[in-house]
Amino acid sequence: MQVLHVCSEMFPLLKTGGLADVIGALPAAQIADGVDARVLLPAFPDIRRGVTDAQVVSRRDTFAGHITLLFGHYNRVGIYLIDAPHLYDRPGSPYHDTNLFAYTDNVLRFALLGWVGAEMASGLDPFWRPDVVHAHDWHAGLAPAYLAARGRPAKSVFTVHNLAYQGMFYAHHMNDIQLPWSFFNIHGLEFNGQISFLKAGLYYADHITAVSPTYTREITEPQFAYGMEGLLQQRHREGRLSGVLNGVDEKIWSPETDLLLASRYTRDTLEDKAENKRQLQIAMGLKVDDKVPLFAVVSRLTSQKGLDLVLEALPGLLEQGGQLALLGAGDPVLQEGFLAAAAEYPGQVGVQIGYHEAFSHRIMGGADVILVPSRFEPCGLTQLYGLKYGTLPLVRRTGGLADTVSDCSLENLADGVASGFVFEDSNAWSLLRAIRRAFVLWSRPSLWRFVQRQAMAMDFSWQVAAKSYRELYYRLK
């Protein structure tokens, strides 16, 4: 079974979000599972520099200009690169300029990505062609459409990492992207009078996956579907929509081997986690005290992530004696709010604006509770890292958060399945009630340690996801 992942980023070469983490880990897990998985990416500068052994496979003149297809390896995974400097050789973000405006030629930049993905199934590399083209998010959404236009030389899977991003472009660009105008209708890639790369993936793929079972159900409902509910309900009825939970890359995220921690530990040596907490308190300007629970946030600061709820509930958390360490950036109003809280509550609130991968490891190793109060969350990786590190997640019951964290209710504690704290309603009162329950458990150290061990024993490895995808691919054949 030969599978080509078509996507726009890959950790650690280039990362703007969780998609990169998935592509950085899933193909390697699939190779270990017996699938010949490779990755197709635009040759953005950071990616091109990282694939040092790239060799020319093919050269083509396309609707988007001349391209060179390269092939090399990164971490023993085969990587195809679309080398088109006029489209991809730009500094900074792969999607927008330094003023945060989307590049005006994004329609060509990402149509080309989908086109090359489909051409791979028609022999663009004469020595390797995929049985399945697996496209990820709107950037690769046209790949299934190009495959359909070519008579489907390979099966296609389209994975939704976040349905909110739809890849919308003006209709006249149908003249530019080498797809038949007949594809531009409601039973195709048209959405609200425009081209939607996301809808193209949803409509033309042989199978759709979303990144958690609960999110898969949610996206068939108007609240979460952004107008796509009719199509997704139809795909669900046809048996062409399913959920595969993302995993954790244990080579990068493991407290036993994490060299970014001051003190490494396992579920059997949890006492060694205390030094990480002490170092984190020092680094964030917090009072060094192992008797108080240290809550943490590592997140984009947006209302989607529920960080306004954290700000509203913060006085209640601090009144009970807790501390907060925050690492993130985003909405300027939220940034200012957290910075003001740090100034008002020195020693109890520490804030670092920005994102630093290494420091996120130190927070995960040192905190007691990781807050993930998202209004919606397709899968979420932060709570999985928390589970792995014995940093109990406090989450809202939505998407992948609902699938991965079991509340510390009396019943779950008795059954030995409790792994964190879960609240229902997207408001500060509901969040604060969950925070209070965290304090109650904190007051019983032996029970807290028991739940930590339960959390750290859970298996969210990529091997589980790789097996699920392999079974899906074979069903499509």
Curated annotation (Swiss-Prot):
The family database entries (NCBIfam families) matched by this protein are listed as:
glgA (TIGR02095), PRK00654.1-2 (NF001899)
**Which InterPro entries does the record cross-reference, listed alphabetically?**
Glyco_trans_1, GS/SS, Starch_synth_cat_dom
Looking up Gene3D superfamilies in the UniProt record yields: Glycogen Phosphorylase B
- Which GO molecular function annotations are given, in alphabetical order? alpha-1,4-glucan glucosyltransferase (ADP-glucose donor) activity; alpha-1,4-glucan glucosyltransferase (UDP-glucose donor) activity
Pfam families reported in the protein's UniProt record: Glyco_transf_5, Glycos_transf_1
EC numbers listed for it are 2.4.1.21
Q: What is this protein called?
A: Glycogen synthase
User: What organism does the record attribute this protein to?
Assistant: Shigella boydii serotype 18 (strain CDC 3083-94 / BS512)
- Say which family it is in: Belongs to the glycosyltransferase 1 family. Bacterial/plant glycogen synthase subfamily.
Q: Which GO terms describe its cellular component?
A: cytosol
Part of which pathway? Answer: Glycan biosynthesis; glycogen biosynthesis
Q: Which residues bind ADP-alpha-D-glucose?
A: K15
Which reactions is this enzyme annotated as catalysing? [(1->4)-alpha-D-glucosyl](n) + ADP-alpha-D-glucose = [(1->4)-alpha-D-glucosyl](n+1) + ADP + H(+)
CDD domains in the cross-refs? GT5_Glycogen_synthase_DULL1-like
Listed PANTHER family:
ALPHA AMYLASE DOMAIN-CONTAINING PROTEIN (PTHR45825:SF11), GRANULE-BOUND STARCH SYNTHASE 1, CHLOROPLASTIC/AMYLOPLASTIC (PTHR45825)
